[in-house]
From Swiss-Prot:
Protein location: Nucleus membrane; Nucleus, Nucleolus
Protein known as: Nucleolar complex protein 4 homolog
Family statement: Belongs to the CBF/MAK21 family.
Protein source organism: Danio rerio
GO BP field: ribosome biogenesis
Membrane topology of the entry: Multi-pass membrane protein
Gene Ontology cellular component list: Noc4p-Nop14p complex; nuclear membrane; nucleolus; small-subunit processome
InterPro entries, A to Z: CCAAT-binding_factor, Noc4
Length: 525
C-alpha cells in the first residue's frame, strides 16, 4: 500500500508544481515586459503529453493574450518577420509588440491543433479559448481596418477554426455540437457559413470530388446546427458589437444570411455524398432547408441524383420533389414516371412499405391527373397483387378502389365485358417504363377477379368489392398500412366461429361423393 500512497503524493506535487509555474510566469509576463521570454515556457505546455497541463496552459495563454490585445501590446497590421527585427531601426516598444504578436500566432496555431486532440476536454478548452480570441480581436483588431467596410471581425481566425472542425480523418460531431452555442451569435453564424463554403470547395476539389465520408459528415453536422432567424428584428445578438450601426454590414442583414445559407448548402450538395447521408438530408429538407431557399428549383438536381440511388431514398427524393411541384407549381414531367417505376414486387417486403403507400396515396390524390396515368397505376398494382402477401393485399385492394373512386373513367377496367371469362391476351405491358405507353386502359382488372378465390377470407372478401357499385366515400387505409402477418393471425385466432367445418367439402348426400372410398365401392339401393 505504501508505494500507492507515495505515487499519489508525487502526482499531487507535480500538479501543484506545474500550476504554480504557469501562474507565476503568467503574472510576470503581464506585470513586466522584461519577462516576455517566459511566454515560451507557458506555450510549451500546450504541447504537453498530459491533458491537465494542456488545459491549464490553454486557460493561461487565453488570459495573457486577451489582456495584451486589450492593452494594445500586440503589433497591428502586416507582421514583419522575426529575422528582420535586428536589421531595422525599430524602437524597443515596437520590437516587443512584434515579438509578442509572433508568440500569439504560435499560440493560436497550437490551440487549433489541439482542437483535434484525443481528449475532448482539451478540444473543448481549446475551442473556447480560440473563440475568446475571436471576440477580443473583434473589439481590438490586429489588422489595419478597411475603412470602406466600417466594421471589423477576425474572419481569418474563424476560417482557420472551421477548417479544423471539418476534419477529413476524425469525427468532430461532439465538438461541433459544443460549437453550436457560438453559432447563436449572428455575426459568427454569417462568417462560419462563408468559411464552410470555402473549406468544402477546397477539400472536395483537392480530392478530385471523391466521396470523403468523415469530412462530409462533419460538414453536414455543422450545417444542421445553423438556424436562420425568421425576422430581421431578431438579429440583435452579436459576438462583436460594432461601434455604430452600418447598413452595409452583411452580417447584420437577414437577406445576406439566407443567401449565404443557400450558397453553402448548394455547394455541399453539388458533390457526390455517402449513400447514408442522402436519407439524413431528405429527412430535414422540408423543414430546415427549403424554407430558406430563394428558388426551390435549385434543389432539383440534388433530388434527381437522390432518386437514382434507389429504395427508400428514391421514395424520399420523390417526396422532396412533390412539395415544390405541388406548392410552387414547378414542372417536373418525369415525377409520376419515376413513381410508377418504383412499383415492383419488392415494395411489399421492405421496411418502408407503409410510408410508400402513404406517400403514393398523397401523390395520386389529385383528381386532375390524366386517366391513362391513373389507369397505369391501377393496372400495375393489380398485376403485382398476384404475388403479394395477404397483409399487402389488404392495403392494395382498397387502394385500387380509392383510385377508381377518384377517377370514374377508370371504371372501364372493371366493366370490360367477358375479360375474365374468356381466354385472351392482356394488352397491358408490365415491362414498359412509361405509363403512357403501357396500354393499361385497353386492359381489365382480371387480377382482382382472380383474387376473389384467394385462400385468405379477408382478401377474397375485399376483392369482391369491385362486383358492386363503388360508394363515393373513400376507404380509410391508414390503419392497414402497418398491418403485419402476426396481427392478421392474431385476429383470426381470436375471432369466434359460428360453425365448425368437419369436412373439406360440405356433405350433401350419404356415400355419394366420388372422393370417398366408401362411396366408390358401396351404393345404397
Amino acid at each position: 500500500m505504501a508505494p500507492s500512497g507515495d505515487s499519489n503524493v508525487k502526482e499531487h506535487n507535480n500538479q501543484v508544481s506545474y500550476k504554480k509555474a504557469i501562474n507565476t510566469k503568467t503574472d510576470l509576463i503581464l506585470q513586466n515586459k522584461k519577462h516576455a521570454n517566459d511566454i515560451f515556457d507557458v506555450i510549451e505546455y500546450l504541447q504537453s503529453e498530459k491533458e491537465k497541463e494542456i488545459i491549464f496552459a490553454t486557460n493561461a495563454c487565453s488570459k495573457i493574450f486577451c489582456e495584451l490585445i486589450e492593452r494594445g501590446d500586440l503589433f497591428v497590421g502586416e507582421l514583419p518577420k522575426e529575422e528582420d527585427l535586428a536589421q531595422g531601426d525599430r524602437s524597443a516598444e515596437e520590437k516587443y509588440h512584434i515579438f509578442m504578436r509572433h508568440r500569439y500566432n504560435s499560440c493560436v496555431e497550437l490551440m487549433l491543433e489541439n482542437v483535434s486532440h484525443e481528449s475532448f476536454q482539451v478540444k473543448e478548452t481549446s475551442l473556447c479559448a480560440v473563440m475568446k480570441f475571436v471576440a477580443t480581436e473583434g473589439k481590438h483588431p490586429l489588422q489595419n481596418l478597411d475603412w470602406s467596410e466600417h466594421y471589423n471581425f477576425p474572419r481569418e481566425l474563424i476560417q482557420a477554426l472551421v477548417e479544423h472542425l471539418l476534419s477529413e480523418k476524425e469525427d468532430m460531431s461532439l465538438l461541433i455540437s459544443r460549437f453550436q452555442e457560438f453559432m447563436e451569435k449572428d455575426d459568427v453564424r454569417y462568417y462560419v457559413m462563408s468559411s464552410v463554403r470555402y473549406s468544402t470547395a477546397t477539400v472536395m476539389e483537392r480530392n478530385k470530388k471523391a466521396v470523403i465520408p468523415v469530412f462530409q459528415n462533419n460538414v453536414f453536422n455543422l450545417l444542421t446546427t445553423i438556424n436562420i432567424p425568421n425576422q430581421a428584428s431578431e438579429m440583435t445578438n452579436f459576438l462583436v458589437q460594432q461601434q455604430s450601426k452600418h447598413d452595409d454590414w452583411k452580417a447584420a442583414k437577414l437577406k445576406e444570411h439566407k443567401r449565404a445559407f443557400e450558397q453553402m448548402w448548394l455547394l455541399f450538395l453539388r458533390y457526390k455524398l455517402p449513400g447514408s447521408m442522402y436519407k439524413k438530408i431528405l429527412v430535414i429538407l422540408h423543414e430546415s432547408i427549403l424554407p430558406q431557399m430563394s428558388d426551390p428549383k435549385l434543389m432539383m438536381d440534388f433530388l434527381s441524383a437522390a432518386y437514382d440511388i434507389g429504395g427508400a431514398i428514391s421514395l424520399s427524393a420523390l417526396n422532396g420533389l412533390f412539395v415544390p411541384i405541388h406548392e410552387h407549381n414547378l414542372d417536373y414531367p418525369d415525377f409520376y414516371k419515376k413513381l410508377y417505376n418504383l412499383l415492383d414486387p419488392s415494395i411489399f417486403h421492405v421496411k418502408y412499405r407503409a410510408r410508400f403507400f402513404h406517400l403514393a396515396n398523397i401523390f395520386l390524390s389529385s383528381t386532375h391527373l390524366p386517366v391513362y396515368l391513373v389507369a397505369a397505376f391501377v393496372k400495375r398494382l393489380a398485376r403485382l397483387s398476384l404475388t403479394a402477401p395477404p397483409t399487402a393485399l389488404l392495403i392494395l385492394l382498397p387502394f385500387i378502389c380509392n383510385l377508381i373512386r377518384r377517377h370514374p373513367s377508370c371504371r372501364v377496367l372493371i366493366h370490360r365485358p367477358s375479360a375474365a371469362d374468356e381466354p385472351c391476351d392482356d394488352p397491358y405491358v408490365m415491362e414498359e417504363e412509361d405509363p403512357a405507353q403501357c396500354h393499361a386502359l385497353e386492359s381489365s382488372l382480371w387480377e382482382i377477379k382472380t383474387l376473389q378465390n384467394h385462400h385468405h377470407p379477408d382478401v377474397s372478401k375485399a376483392a369482391t368489392m369491385i362486383n358492386e357499385p363503388l360508394s363515393a366515400q373513400e376507404e380509410d387505409i391508414s390503419e392497414l398500412l402497418e398491418l403485419t402477418t402476426f396481427e392478421l393471425m392474431e385476429r383470426e385466432l381470436k375471432g369466434e366461429k359460428k360453425t365448425v367445418p368437419l369436412e373439406f367439402d360440405m356433405a350433401t348426400d350419404l356415400l355419394k361423393s366420388s372422393r370417398e372410398v366408401l362411396g366408390v365401392h358401396f351404393t345404397l339401393e
